[in-house]
Amino acid sequence: MPLSQTGLLYKDLIGYHEYEGLALNLDEQKRLVEDLGKNKQLLILKNHGLLTCGRTIPEAFIMMYYLEQACKIQIAAQAGNEVSLPKPEVQDLVHQQAMKGFGSKLGEMEFIALKRRLARLGSDYAS
């Protein structure tokens, strides 16, 4: 739902996959790919979780982070009274601005900063 600025970042990039039980059936791989399609980078796996695809690990990570934030915002908003959606032209504008501004380096700055933070905390994530 295009409810928040964070949610608008991914307008038209989200696909949905029906829950099929535990992911033990290899045939589900084909359906996941079909639901992702050619133009989607994110999947909401109904009754299960989220999946993101990126050109790089930092891109996939940051898209997952903001998709999760958008979901949290939506759940919190829907728990209250009636939600107010931005006008369709504003939704399109925000999405276009985000896509133009992200470029090919999406997530790199954040990912590098997170790795530095882990190193400072003494994490052995890289071993």
Regions found by a protein language model. Give the residues of each.
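Glycine-rich flexible loops
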Residues: 1-127
